[in-house]
Amino acid sequence: MTPNPHIKNAKTAPVRNPGLFFLCAYFFAFFLFSCKSADFSSLSDSFNADSFAENFEWQRIDEGVYLYSSDSKNQYRIVKIDLSNPNIRITASPDNGEWQKAESVKMFAKHTDSLVAINTTPFYALNRLPFSKVKPAGLVIINKNKISEARANYCAFALFSAGGSFYGKIFDTQEECINNSPAPDYAFGGFWVILKDGEILPFKKYKDYRSAAGLANGGKTLFLLAGKNLTCYDCALILKSAGADNAMEFDGGSSSQMCINRKRMLMKFDRMPASILGIRICANQ
């Protein structure tokens, strides 16, 4: 999540009910896990990017959609999606770029009937309360409509329709994305490109929760990754090993989450994001 530098301190009315203790405990947990970078001192540190060698055994979860879960306490999950499948449908939020109530990735997956859903664009929040209104801090395009403006110096992931199916493309900047011809059907801002033409780009080795996207086969194969205790380099290495030749980072930290069949893949306290990408399979439609 991207903090809003113009936020004023929120004022809350006294709570006069027997559930005060539980409410306070809830807010304490929220501030502990969402208002600062996650503390990974108690998590597995078994991932070693320098000696990484993963044998990806994909599990089919639907037509053209495959899942792989790492062995080390499910440190990460990666989904491989065949975008050339004509039965794929894209779901996305939000429907406008104004301040609005956020929803969790799980809630989004449920009401859109998405097989796979993942958080995308970084965002602003009015305050640090769990149900604060939010809005995207970067590019969002849905059904060719620009929902949120581009943000300078940050990357973008886009989807284009062609011949009854989709293909994806990753852009170094969001301005490059909106100036592309043809115009994207869907686009989501992120932070940085981490893998370009098969080359892993250098980043500081800071571990956190991560959400990322990768592409292969001329954009026809999409990889979506969500994991814990990972650096940007780790994400790039995992996606490259899975077959991607280009990849980028979505919003990370407490906002990271991916749902498959409406089940959360990261077991943690979630900050509800402003923008979500979902994949549906609609056979015979």
Where are the regions that the model predicts?
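Short, low-complexity, intrinsically disordered N-terminal modules
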Residues: P3-H6, F31
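Positively charged N-terminal leader segments that act as targeting/secretion signals
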Residues: P5-F21
